[in-house]
A protein has these predicted regions:
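N-terminal signal-anchor transmembrane alpha helix
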Residues: 3-30
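Membrane-interface helix-boundary motifs at transmembrane edges
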Residues: 2, 81-90
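Small-polar-interrupted transmembrane alpha-helices in polytopic inner-membrane proteins
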Residues: 14-19, 75, 90-112
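Membrane-interface loop-to-helix entry segments
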Residues: 58-73, 120-131
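Membrane-interface helix caps and helix-loop-helix hairpins in membrane proteins
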Residues: 58, 85-86, 111-121
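Extracytosolic (periplasmic/ER-lumenal) interhelical loops and adjacent juxtamembrane/interface segments
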Residues: 27-61
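Membrane-interfacial alpha-helical segments at the cytosolic side of multi-pass membrane proteins
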Residues: 67-85, 131-142
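Short, highly charged, low-complexity non-transmembrane loops/tails of multi-pass membrane proteins
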Residues: 146-175
Length: 178
């Protein structure tokens, strides 16, 4: 199970590193940067006014999504210190909902013009939701990795000549059809 966790952690950090690789390569490798931005555009609005910048180029995702990805990655890294890797039980769903509440409040207050959220508030609410979501994803990975019972393929045998004998037919008497 540790091996699966290690491979998953490398994958998660590789994905998160793309958020920083996009702006760092935007000047020197625009095709690579455009591909990364395009991939993350399917998941994030990427508005410049809501994104962090490096070297004059915006991150591949907004500040809130940066928080979600970063929170997920760092909690994923710390997960073995917090729970057994083989644990396949999920926490009650209410914890995931509660982790999303600050994000919803942050969004809602801005949407209704009560206050203007900041990069920091977006990042922090994203960190919280991303960190909590690991506790719902990792048990699924653990369950898939530790599943030992696989459906066995059915075995086929040739039928004996007795079982292949034909049954009497009712077609000789039309009034007794099934």
């Amino acid at each position: 199970m540790r091996r699966i966790w290690l491979i998953s952690t490398i994958f998660v950090f590789a994905l998160v590193s793309l958020i920083l690789i996009a702006p760092l390569t935007a000047g020197s490798e625009p095709h690579l940067a455009r591909s990364i931005y395009g991939g993350f555009a399917l998941l994030c609005h990427q508005l410049p006014e809501r994104s962090y910048f490096i070297a004059g180029h915006k991150f591949a995702v907004c500040a809130r999504c940066t928080g979600v990805y970063a929170g997920f990655a760092f909690t994923f890294l710390l997960y073995p210190l917090l729970r057994p890797l083989r644990a396949i039980d999920w926490p009650p769903p209410v914890w995931l909902v509660l982790a999303a509440v600050p994000m919803a409040i942050d969004f809602g207050l801005t949407f209704f013009g009560i206050w203007e959220n900041t990069h920091t508030s977006r990042l922090l609410t994203g960190l919280l939701l991303g960190g909590v979501s690991v506790f719902y994803v990792m048990p699924g990975i653990a369950e898939l990795a530790t599943r030992k019972t696989r459906a066995k393929r059915p075995t086929f045998t040739l039928a004996s000549s007795e079982s292949m004998a034909s049954a009497p037919s009712d077609y000789s008497a039309p009034d007794r059809r099934i």
